[in-house]
């Protein structure tokens, strides 16, 4: 049998995936969504680690480059990749764009696996509804729900093969007309009816949309596989305002939550100092919940 020769690209991918698989700890981990807007990915990852966090979430600005380029930038920083974003056009009115969104999600699921990430984050659409109301046959919302479920069902095989969780993220009504609450995401997941589809519970959006975050997560926390954190309507770092995360954390603990707690916010002052304070605050709130 001839020996298999592996390229440098293959070594990077295989090594990164193996390291990630062997070094995923049990219990919650703390992450940050791409701090320092003008910094390089490496600088951001190093900042996250200096502030005491376990990893970094990657937005779309980093994902149009080869996986090995991302791995090279993160090499030696000690920062894990918690999640990456997926498409935002699964509910576009153009069927060509919807098909392209499904294909992009397939690519992102593979990329997430190569980077050792746990999840791909999906916001189906931003902005107002653009579909026609087809009543009495079907309302515009029912059209959207059926299209979204159909699009997600096309990804069930990819989710199963990669082992990556596809997250549905409910956003507040100022950002999207569709899927604003945890219950709505849960309904979509139930309609898809396949493992590997879960919700992202964003405390910033929930502050604006849910009457009681603790009660909401007591009911729907079983769907939660990832968490975003920020304080108040200005979306500042946790601990900058007197916001109590403990009721929500307590509900998540009852469901056995052991995923990422990721800060997605601005900073009230020096980013490293602000993130350090936020981490101390979140660890204290989690332990007290």
Give names to the regions the model predicted.
Residues 2-6, 10-30, 38-49, 116-118, ...:
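Histidine-acidic metal/acid-base catalytic patches
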Residues 15-22, 97-198:
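Active-site acidic/histidine proton-transfer and metal-coordination neighborhood
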Residues 28-40, 90-102, 138-144:
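Active-site mouth loops of central-metabolism enzymes
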Residues 31-32, 55-59, 168-169, 200-202, ...:
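Short catalytic-loop micro-motif centered on adjacent basic/acidic residues
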Residues 36-38, 62, 87-90, 126-128, ...:
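Active-site-proximal loop/turn and secondary-structure-junction residues that shape catalytic pockets
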Residues 47-65, 85-90, 96, 100:
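N-terminal substrate-binding region of glycoside hydrolase catalytic domains
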Residues 64-73:
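Active-site-adjacent beta->alpha loops and helix N-cap segments on the catalytic face
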């Amino acid at each position: 049998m001839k020996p298999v020769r592996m390229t440098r690209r293959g070594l990077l991918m295989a090594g990164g995936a193996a390291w990630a698989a062997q070094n995923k700890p049990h219990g919650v981990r703390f992450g940050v969504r791409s701090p320092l807007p003008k910094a390089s990915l490496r600088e951001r990852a190093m900042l996250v680690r200096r502030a005491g966090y376990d990893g970094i979430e990657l937005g779309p600005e980093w994902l149009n480059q080869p996986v090995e380029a991302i791995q090279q930038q993160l090499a030696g920083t000690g920062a894990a990749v918690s999640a990456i974003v997926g498409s935002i056009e699964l509910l576009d009115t153009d069927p060509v764009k919807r098909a392209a969104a499904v294909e992009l999600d397939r690519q992102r699921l593979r990329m997430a696996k190569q980077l050792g990430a746990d999840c791909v984050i999906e916001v189906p659409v931003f902005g107002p509804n653009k579909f026609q109301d087809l009543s009495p046959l079907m309302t515009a919302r029912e059209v959207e729900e059926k299209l979204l479920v159909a699009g997600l069902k096309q990804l069930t095989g990819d989710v199963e093969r990669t082992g990556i969780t596809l997250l549905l993220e409910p956003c507040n009504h100022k950002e999207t007309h569709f899927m604003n609450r945890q219950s709505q995401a849960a309904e979509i997941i139930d309609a898809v009816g396949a493992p590997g589809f879960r919700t992202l519970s964003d405390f910033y959006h929930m502050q604006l949309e849910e009457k009681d975050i603790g009660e909401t997560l007591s009911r729907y926390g079983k769907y939660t596989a990832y968490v975003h954190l920020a304080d108040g309507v200005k979306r500042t770092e946790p601990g900058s305002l007197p916001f109590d995360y403990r009721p929500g954390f307590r509900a998540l603990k009852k469901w056995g939550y052991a995923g990422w707690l990721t800060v997605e916010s601005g900073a009230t002052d020096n980013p490293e100092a602000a993130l350090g304070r936020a981490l101390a605050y979140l660890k204290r709130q989690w332990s007290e919940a």
